[in-house]
Regions:
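Arg/Lys-rich, low-complexity, intrinsically disordered basic segments
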Residues: 1-82
């Protein structure tokens, strides 16, 4: 159903496609080109930036909240990076 590709946007990690049609981009990349760390990259292209720190993961959810609109960038970040 979903296909993930390295993003064509310089400040995003992934582009999401649904049935071949672009849906959304998600995951942050700093202005210097370095990806922000995530808890665990389930897609795997940025797994060297996994931190696996439970407390940091909890702080992320405290800042951003646990609820996300279906098929939004936040939804995919929560499902595939956090």
């Amino acid at each position: 159903m979903y296909t993930f590709k390295i993003s064509t946007k310089k400040n995003k990690k992934y582009d999401v496609f649904k049935n071949g049609k672009y849906l959304v981009s998600f995951g942050g990349i700093k202005p210097d080109g370095t990806p922000y760390q995530q808890y665990y990259d389930k897609i795997g292209k940025y797994s060297k930036y996994n931190h696996l720190d439970e407390k940091r993961k909890d702080r992320y959810y405290q800042r951003h909240g646990k609820k996300a609109v279906f098929e939004s960038a936040k939804y995919f970040s929560h499902a595939y990076l956090w």
